[in-house]
Amino acid sequence: MSQADRPAVVARDISKSFGPFVAVDRVSFAVEHGEIFGFLGSNGAGKTTTIRMLCGLLAPTSGTATVLGFDVAREAGEIKRRIGYMSQRFSLYSDLTVEENLRFWGGTYGLFGQRLADRLAWAIATAELAGERRVLVRELPGGFRQRLALVAALIHEPPIVFLDEPTGGVDPEARRRFWDLIDALAGSGTTVFVTTHSMDEAERCHRVALMHAGRLLALDSVPALKRIFPPGTVVEVACSRPAQAVAAIERLPGIEEVALFGERLRVVLASPADGAGIAARIREAGCADAVIAPVEPSLEDVFIHVIAEAEGAAAR
């Protein structure tokens, strides 16, 4: 089987321990070529440790993984030469200009002459930095620096790029423009492996792995993940006394989860028929203005649900 026929990334039961602490616990998955693969989880879920193992920066304690057909433990050097990597920490030189940084990173990957000039032109155009090419990096706004870091990681045209929480600390518009770049990359065939704790960003991935406490709890496309809830089992309650409404219904039979978001409640039912009981109890609690309506499950609903199930199973 040629490399083009194999997944871009294959992980089989990879684990990483630091002394007694297990940061990643027997995680398995595969990433296809040209896919935007999201690794979703809160801080401490094991996302960065996993990405560092795949980039050849950390050896797994156990299990195996390959990237572009190369083993992460035995062939880390081959992997590093062939991938792009954007770490959580900004890794460019703040006392160099935009162009100087790109020339430096191009040189580290063996680019020179016309090839370097072509890639430099591509990077500046793609990141929309033509007017900033001679500006010191430390003077750039956060969104500009993030786009620069991305194209620097892609200067050598790697077939796969690893992005670790790439939009941390930037405003929503900068985040949207950054993700437009990611979409364009995947459209041109580049594989994108991205870690995030943002539900909105995860929604833009082709498939999402849900990580919690070092373990992979679920993996599928976003629409498929949302289908874990039967139709009509996720409802939203709007009322003037949301705290009273929560107290009134959270112990009702048939209520699996209740979460308060501002003046609205998000409720997961065991079955759609349980919704009638909610309406009656809320009104008995003095919330006569309550409006209850079924809504499409969100990725956050899924994440909360699978974590609750995993923690419940661990407690049994």
Where are these regions (language model features)?
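ABC transporter nucleotide-binding domain
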Residues: 180-270, 293
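A generic structural signal for secondary-structure junctions
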Residues: 84, 110, 230-231, 254, ...
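Short phosphate-engaging motifs
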Residues: 63, 75, 201, 244-245, ...
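ABC transporter nucleotide-binding domains
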Residues: 6-11, 16-211, 218
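C-terminal coupling/interaction segments
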Residues: 3, 269-316
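Conserved protein kinase catalytic domain
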Residues: 80, 124, 226, 300-304
